[in-house]
């Protein structure tokens, strides 16, 4: 009924210059219409009534609601299909890898994998977080090791040559006390004597190797020299400092039993070149060393008297001592003189030091001091 009523009403857009443009316009049209090349005749009531009775819906109304449904349903299915394909491909690749691993495995590869696992396990134990129980156990082990080291230091049995705490095993305890001087400040000494003796902790074995003489003779002489040093400790100004509970060997101060300096360069060279003469010199003067003071103070006094009593212009410039050298220790002044290369002034030293003797008979001995211009 509504459709019939609408068909009786004329269309409003027909009065407009463009006319009605709607294809599915329900209102009555008295004029024909041309819409995008489609010709539509004027509407009649009979045709409209038949169409309404048959129940044929207009094509535009039925097609429009179906299109959005199709557009919505299409994008939902595609991603599902793609996902299933990827999963299947991954499963196939995994199966192929398993099959290849079963075929390619050899006993060598299996052993390598086991070794790698063991290494990883050990490294994990090393780098893992330590619990307080582990720390306490490690401390107990460290304390046991320290106690064992202290016992070995007290006994002195496990000490070897080359360590910083070496003790010469050939000497007795009394001789060790004479040789080893402990220092409380624990600071290293950089004396000239350490460099002259070749450095190191135990200079006596090093001097034996350097001279290349019999060890028994040197040891006997060193024993007597150490005994004389212990008796004349005030002269050397170095006292042995030993604790009652002495653990280990501490650093020692150097006691230099040999003369540090020589007034003549020829005397230094002769003594360095003839070690056997040096040993004979020590043998002849054993008793005098024990009675008199140490070599150092005797030679210092002799050098001071020589430097004070020497004529200012009578001695050559390379062998003289200036006034500034009176308060200082005498220093070596090496020269390239052909007369002073292999000789020394023996008679002058015999007068000044009564217990000094010549080193060898083959060397020339000048009885008189040489003057400037003398041959």
Curated annotation (Swiss-Prot):
Pfam families: DUF5571, zf-CCCH_3. Residues 54-78 are annotated as: Disordered. Disulfide bonds: none annotated. GO terms for biological process: poly(A)+ mRNA export from nucleus. This is Uncharacterized protein C12orf50 homolog. It comes from Bos taurus (Bovine).
């Amino acid at each position: 009924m509504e459709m019939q009523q609408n068909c009786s009403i004329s269309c409003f857009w027909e009065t407009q210059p463009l006319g009605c443009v709607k294809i599915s316009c329900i209102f009555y049209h008295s004029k024909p219409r041309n819409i995008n090349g489609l010709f539509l005749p004027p509407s009649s009531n009979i045709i409209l009534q038949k169409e309404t009775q048959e129940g044929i819906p207009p094509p535009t109304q039925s097609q429009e609601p179906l299109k959005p449904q199709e557009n919505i349903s299409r994008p939902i299915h595609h991603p599902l299909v793609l996902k299933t394909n990827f999963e299947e491909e991954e499963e196939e690749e995994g199966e192929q890898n398993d099959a290849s691993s079963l075929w390619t495995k050899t006993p060598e590869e299996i052993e390598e994998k086991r070794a790698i696992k063991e290494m990883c396990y050990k490294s994990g134990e090393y780098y893992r977080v330590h619990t307080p129980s582990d720390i306490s156990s490690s401390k107990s082990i460290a304390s046991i090791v320290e106690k064992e080291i202290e016992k070995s230091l007290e006994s002195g049995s496990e000490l070897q040559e080359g360590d910083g705490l070496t003790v010469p095993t050939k000497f007795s305890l009394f001789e060790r006390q004479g040789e080893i001087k402990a220092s409380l400040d624990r600071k290293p000494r950089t004396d000239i004597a350490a460099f002259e003796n070749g450095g190191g902790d135990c200079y006596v074995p090093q001097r034996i190797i350097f001279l290349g003489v019999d060890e028994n003779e040197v040891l006997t002489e060193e024993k007597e020299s150490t005994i004389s040093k212990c008796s004349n400790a005030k002269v050397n100004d170095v006292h042995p400092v030993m604790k009652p509970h002495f653990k280990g060997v501490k650093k020692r101060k150097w006691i230099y039993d040999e003369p540090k300096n020589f007034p003549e360069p020829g005397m230094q060279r002769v003594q360095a070149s003839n070690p056997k003469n040096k040993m004979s010199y020590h043998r002849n003067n054993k008793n005098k060393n024990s009675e008199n003071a140490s070599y150092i103070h005797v030679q210092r006094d002799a050098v001071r008297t020589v430097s004070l009593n020497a004529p200012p212009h009578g001695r050559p410039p390379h062998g003289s001592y200036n006034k500034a050298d009176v308060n200082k220790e005498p220093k070596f002044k090496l020269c390239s003189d052909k007369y002073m290369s292999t000789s020394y002034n023996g008679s002058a030293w015999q007068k000044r030091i009564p217990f000094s003797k010549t080193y060898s008979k083959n060397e020339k001995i000048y009885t008189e001091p040489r003057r400037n211009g003398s041959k």
